[in-house]
């Protein structure tokens, strides 16, 4: 698995016994697979599912009931911030961790305005996701 093979470990203890569910929406098969493998190795978390399109992300959210959706802002056909708004409008919406290749203060502000709970740059995905999850679930 990616997490163990690369030596990554999340020392964050769980405050309860419940496993948190993470879903991933990303159009890149390689990134989606790597992210799924990392999530599968995270203590206290379980992979709820993956999809390669933004529109299928809504179906995944409604069917799998994740606690967190990792959403690539570039996933077609509906782009970025509009998709964050759609997901957050769903009843019982999960936390949305937006992912981007261009992690800038402007991108973070725009993602926050759209309703994203965190923004993670893909260039620092492991550290960024670990930090975002620690903030979302202290």
Residue ranges and their predicted role:
Residues 52-68:
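Acidic, metal-coordinating helix/loop segments flanking the phosphotransfer/catalytic sites
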Residues 82, 103-120, 124, 130-131:
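Alpha4 helix (beta4-alpha4-beta5 surface) of REC/receiver domains from two-component response regulators
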Residues 81-92:
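Short amphipathic alpha-helix used as the core "switch/output" element in two-component signaling
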Residues 53, 79-82:
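Acidic catalytic/metal-coordinating carboxylates
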Residues 1-21, 31, 128-138:
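Non-catalytic signal-transmission and effector/linker regions of two-component phosphorelay proteins
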Residues 19-30, 35-39:
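Conserved acidic segment of CheY-like receiver
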Residues 72-73:
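Active-site residues of response regulator receiver
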């Amino acid at each position: 698995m990616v997490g163990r093979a690369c030596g990554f470990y999340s020392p964050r203890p769980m405050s309860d016994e419940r496993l948190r569910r993470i879903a991933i929406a990303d159009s890149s098969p390689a990134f989606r697979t790597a992210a799924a493998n990392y999530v599968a190795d995270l203590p206290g978390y379980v992979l709820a599912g993956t999809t390669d399109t933004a529109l299928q992300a809504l179906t995944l959210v409604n069917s799998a009931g994740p606690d967190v959706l990792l959403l690539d802002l570039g996933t077609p056909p509906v782009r970025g911030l509009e998709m964050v708004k759609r997901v957050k409008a769903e009843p019982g919406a999960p936390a949305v961790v937006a992912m981007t290749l261009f992690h800038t203060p402007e991108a973070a502000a725009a993602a926050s305005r759209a309703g994203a709970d965190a923004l993670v740059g893909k260039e620092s995905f492991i550290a960024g996701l670990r930090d975002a999850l620690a903030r979302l679930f202290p």
